[in-house]
Amino acid sequence: MSPKSANSTPTTTPKAKARPKPKRKAKRRRVNPALAWARRLARYRPRLLEDTLDALASIYGPQVWRRRLDPTSELILTILTQNSADTNAEKAFVALRAAYPSGLPDEIHEPGVGWGGDGLPPGAPPDWPAVEAAPLAELIDVIRPGGLAPTKAPRLQATLRRIREERGDHSLEFLGDMAPLAARDWLTTIPGIGKKTASVLLLFCFNHPLMPVDRHVERVAKRIGLVPAKALPDLATDQFNAMLAGFPERTYEAHVLLIHHGRAICQARSPKHDLCPIRDRCSFVDPKAP
């Protein structure tokens, strides 16, 4: 028998204290920079965009949306304008009409203030299946007046091929029934089509509230503080769309008025400050402007 008493209580080893589980760091919500900018602008400079548009409309007049071309023609014409003068792109498009006639009803392309050419004469859209199937050397020769033909001809055919493979034909009318951002996302899956090109098509063909930001829009917007001075074009595009979310019906007006102002008064060199109705908010005139 153990020398210990039978009634003695057995000793127990104290349990080690469990280590506290490390606290998980709360995931930081990802901030949308475009929305953040729009909210900041609304807080510190309320009505800046609306007041700017009102001031510009007082000298350039009201801007009414009107469809120019069918969406496939608009897309091809926009591709032809890339790194080329609008007047040269018009020559190339007219040459496409003549070389590949479709026999469809005529369209009228009236140039707006954002268009640097003379506008297209009335004419039917080209026969897109024939353009896609044309020998490459032949197509290069047809669109040569537009400039950069060896680069643009294969791009045109690849774009038309992609549309046909996705949709069964070359029509882009279905984009009018899609939500604006979904339609833009679809277009930007096509190689060589960015946000600006897609937004131009969707705004001018369907009046979708998507803001194309070209060099004139960007220059005016940065000078008056609508977008940050160092914003890259894609971010500036998103910031504009965030600002216009409260009044999307003014998107076309905003695009046209800012282009008009950038061409006529707020030029890159020697802007005409004495004629500018928004010079009181321009950092180019006064670096301390609000």
Regions found by a protein language model. Name each.
Residues M1-L41, K288:
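Polybasic, lysine-enriched low-complexity intrinsically disordered terminal tails
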